[in-house]
A protein has these predicted regions:
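Soluble catalytic regions of large protease machineries
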Residues: 1-174
Length: 174
């Protein structure tokens, strides 16, 4: 949606920094394979091949549903990390309903489609993710980490998951 469209490359690096920081802070970094700054929006965060794959007929419906719900939470948190980092860290302002409404609506749609979540359940998941991401990016240290990560990404252009995690660790995240 338009709220996640990038104004320029700097905006894009901060969005990617926000997603990466959120993945690591939420302990979901195992899903990340690579970061590509020059990729099209939506393709900058390369996830591991099994992320989003739920079609194994040997898995129980409960396991598949739980995996889908976990991935919805991870994706929601990443989208929120993207916009929160860009707003809090780069623009130095808070979120508005114009920032969050498109993400909330996407969570409702995806939650219904992939997890059979009712609107109130999808909204609760969204609010939990927003609360977590807000707490992460309220720390001034995280602002410094995000800015340094964005600068390094701009210089390198690509990073493996391991390089990104090591960089965040060296910057004090963990």
């Amino acid at each position: 949606d338009s709220v996640l469209r990038y104004a320029d490359e700097r905006d894009k690096t901060f969005g990617i920094a926000g997603m990466t920081i959120t993945l690591v802070a939420c302990r979901d970094e195992e899903f990340l394979a690579e970061i590509r700054l020059d990729a099209e929006p939506g393709e900058t965060m390369v996830m591991k091949h099994d992320y989003g794959m739920r079609a194994n007929p040997r898995m129980s419906a409960k396991i598949i549903w739980t995996q889908a719900l976990d991935e919805l939470r991870t994706t929601t948190s990443m989208a929120l990390g993207n916009i929160v980092c860009r707003r809090y860290v780069m623009a130095r302002r808070g979120l508005t309903p114009a920032d969050t409404t498109p993400i909330r609506e996407a969570v409702r749609s995806e939650g219904l489609t992939h997890c059979s979540l009712e609107q109130d359940e999808a909204d609760a998941l969204f609010e939990r993710c927003l609360s977590t991401v807000d707490r992460i990016f309220r720390h001034s240290t995280v602002h410094q980490v995000a800015a340094a990560f964005a600068d390094e990404l701009s210089a390198r252009r690509t990073m493996s998951a391991r390089e990104a995690i090591e960089l965040l660790s060296s910057l004090g995240l963990r």
